[in-house]
Amino acid sequence: MRHAAYGKPHRGSYNRGAHAPNTGTGTMINGELIDLVAGDYEARIASSGAMLVHLRRQGRDLIMPFDAQATLPAGWQGKTLLPWANRIAGSRYDYAGTEFLVGCNEPASGSALHGLAGWMDWQVADDDPSGADDGAPRSRVVLELSLLASYGYPWSLEASACFELDAERGLSVTVTATNVGAARPAPPVPGAPEVKGEPAPAPYGVSCHPYLTRSVPLDDCVLTIPAAEVLDVDEHMAPTSLRSVEGTDWDWRGGRLVGATQTDNAYTALPEGTWEVSLRGGQGNRAVVMSSDVPWVQAYTADELSRPGVAIEPMTCPPNAFNSGEDLIALKVGQSHSFTYRLHEED
């Protein structure tokens, strides 16, 4: 079993072979912890789920942190989510004429939530491409995962997540996945459907799950989401219809006080190119800003967690895309897809 040291960030700070502090369990809860530093920014990454544990600037939290040495994250915080984003309604999907069943991990809705990679142990792929040999802090790390084919998802993916911290730009994260093979069906054992004698491309979506936070309650912050449409959901959190945000509680385009408003919805009709979502408030009235260029973003006011922040989840596709096909990515064997998001603080 590998253990990690969690002292002051330094070259190779995950220190394979060192022992973690005694948490009462004798186990390494969230895998290896890697600390990054650049200018006034510092970040911690955990290998479990290629997870962003904390991100700070001058000591101020930009995302909701947690004690990764002793506890599990609440509400998927900071996880890298693939090969689907959000929910598969009913934990089943039809693809290329074949029905697949996936594990339900949200009993209240009956859904398969947030993909397959969020609790897997990703591997550190580089020893320190950024730090100097004199022990300077590292500012970049790459984690890799081999996601093998399974009954519910009979495609194998090679995935990587590159976390890079910059003194001016903050944190940039790029997640790349490549389809490296598909299992052929051998009844009664399921496999990838065949299209014209070849395995169907792998259905794919990707997202992330940081909770933006400020030093004041969420109710006292100003949230800006430049989306013109919102996706309604039913009692099982399955999508029902897309509608304009105009005149609703979900119109955040001009930036407004969160107050008591609750949302756990996907938003779209975002500006072309790179868009920004921001949460402003607290010390110096600064904003934490999430930017990406994907067509969807989920906003969740974390009401079940007593509203410590708002989850902003850029998504390549909407909830239940494995059934609807909307904005679903199809990766042929050998094809890759990359997704990037950035987090920084704005004065």
What is each stretch, according to the model?
Residues 93-102, 175, 330-346:
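Short Pro-Gly-centered flexible turn/kink motifs
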Residues 103-167:
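Extended, loop-rich substrate-binding clefts of extracytoplasmic carbohydrate-active enzymes
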Residues 41, 111-126, 251-324:
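Acidic/His-leaning functional-site neighborhoods
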Residues 42-101, 105:
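Acidic-aromatic substrate-binding/catalytic surfaces of carbohydrate-active enzymes
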Residues 5-25, 129-136, 181-200, 232:
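Intrinsically disordered, low-complexity terminal tails and inter-domain linkers enriched
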Residues 43, 145-187, 193-204, 208-215:
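Acidic, contiguous internal or C-terminal segments within carbohydrate-active enzymes
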Residues 183-185, 189-190, 194-203, 210-292:
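Active-site/ligand-binding surface loops and adjacent short beta/alpha elements
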Residues 24-39:
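Short, Gly/Pro- and small/polar-rich lid/capping loops
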